[in-house]
Amino acid sequence: LADVTKAQALKHPNWDMGAKITIDSATMMNKGLEVIEAKWLFNLKPEQIDVIVHPQSIIHSAVQFEDGSMKAQMGLPDMKLPIQYALAYPNRLSANFPRFNFMDYPSLTFEAPDTETFGNLALAFKAMEEGGSMPCVLNAANEVAVDAFLNDKIKFLQIQAVIEETMQKTKKVEHPSVDEYIEIDREARATTRELIK
């Protein structure tokens, strides 16, 4: 991955997204941020959240209940339908989105994430486990690092390196106020920019 170019990183096989989110997908930071979201949205502990790589991008999310049964949100790799459902919940609105056909996807595969190669996912779990201001630091550093990559200031693998170093250099605040979050975000961005120089 040391020689991954911007053009290569921006070519996602299944999704049509903006540049920043596409790079987050390529580094697996998108999954890391989704893990942090899941923790807060569903009041989960880190050990209750699993990440599974699904190359076909058909199953967007799944929940396993206490009895072992599961529910999954499945569909074509397009966020229009999940967003429509989220906005209309609990109602279902008719839509003329393309329909999913199981015969077009005769097999769905799943893999464990490679956190050695894609360390941003591990950094996100670390930030979530540390708690306090660390998820804010992670996000701020990632935004600056991805912007630097997109502007040819750093290489692909440096994205993770500068995020990790920013997290190491930034003091954690256990229970930050909103004003403190704003300041922590500003400081983390400044630290990341300094590391990139």
Q: Where are these predicted regions, by residue range?
A:
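Catalytic, metal-anchored helix/loop core of enzyme active sites in primary metabolism
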Residues: 1-197
